Amino acid sequence: MADAYSNAAASAGYDVHRIEVAQLAFPLLRTQADFETGALPPELVQPSEDLRWAQHWVFLFPLWHGTMPALFKGFLEQAFRPGFAMEYNPKGFPRRLLAGRSARIVVTMGMPALMYRWYFGAYGVRGFERSMLSFAGIKPIRESLYGLTFADEKKRARWLEEMRRYGERGD
């Protein structure tokens, strides 16, 4: 799905920078002090610059235990430090430093997407949207949820075509 989206976006003339979090080796944040004042690990400097540069972000991940994989969450915690995603304001709400950007969240899962939305309330995706992306000023945020259970080849081909269309539109 990531290939379908990024290849179509590049073919449509968009400048695509891919960050494959699973290929990165970085330490997890362990204290509030590390989050607030610690240095960004060297291996995350370029990915962080790529995020700051991009006007549209696409996050694609598998659903693990109802939410994003821990490594992806650890990456976001490192990247979304004060001064990158928001700036604290002692007199009110933090200043949103990522305003003007948009995002698409693409999630694959081993259950029907309708069940994740209806029964589980899509809490992992909603939490990501509200507590990180929206809070930092990113909007609009669109989501695409794909339940791989019972998906035949025809349905999977439609999903890849959908990703290509999103890529072509830069959506």
Segments predicted by a language model, with ranges:
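N-terminal beta1-alpha1 ligand-phosphate binding loop
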Residues: 1-14, 19
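N-terminal beta-loop-helix "entrance" segment that forms/cooperates
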Residues: 18-40, 156
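Anion (oxyanion) recognition and catalysis
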Residues: 10, 52, 134
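Hydrophobic/aromatic beta-strand patches that form the interior of the parallel beta-sheet core
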Residues: 17-19, 58, 104-107, 141-144
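Helix-loop-strand module that forms the ligand-binding subsite of alpha/beta enzymes
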Residues: 39-129
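Generic structural signal for helix capping and beta-alpha/helix-loop junctions
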Residues: 25-26, 68, 113, 150
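Glycine-rich phosphate/pyrophosphate-binding loop and the adjoining helix
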Residues: 118-171
